[in-house]
Swiss-Prot record:
Belongs to the Psb30/Ycf12 family. PSII is composed of 1 copy each of membrane proteins PsbA, PsbB, PsbC, PsbD, PsbE, PsbF, PsbH, PsbI, PsbJ, PsbK, PsbL, PsbM, PsbT, PsbY, PsbZ, Psb30/Ycf12, peripheral proteins of the oxygen-evolving complex and a large number of cofactors. It forms dimeric complexes. The keyword Disulfide bond does not apply. InterPro entries: PSII_Ycf12_core-subunit (IPR010284). A core subunit of photosystem II (PSII), probably helps stabilize the reaction center. The keyword Membrane applies. This is Photosystem II reaction center protein Psb30.
Length: 33
């Protein structure tokens, strides 16, 4: 298996999971939620 492909897939999954969480945390800090 290609290590670079695995790294890219894991990074994409982490970004897709962490993205909405970070946005939600920013909204909570600003008090807009």
């Amino acid at each position: 298996m290609n290590i670079e492909l695995i790294v890219q897939l894991t990074s994409l999954i982490l970004i897709s999971i962490a993205g909405p969480i970070i946005i939600a945390l920013l909204f909570v800090k600003q008090g807009n939620l």
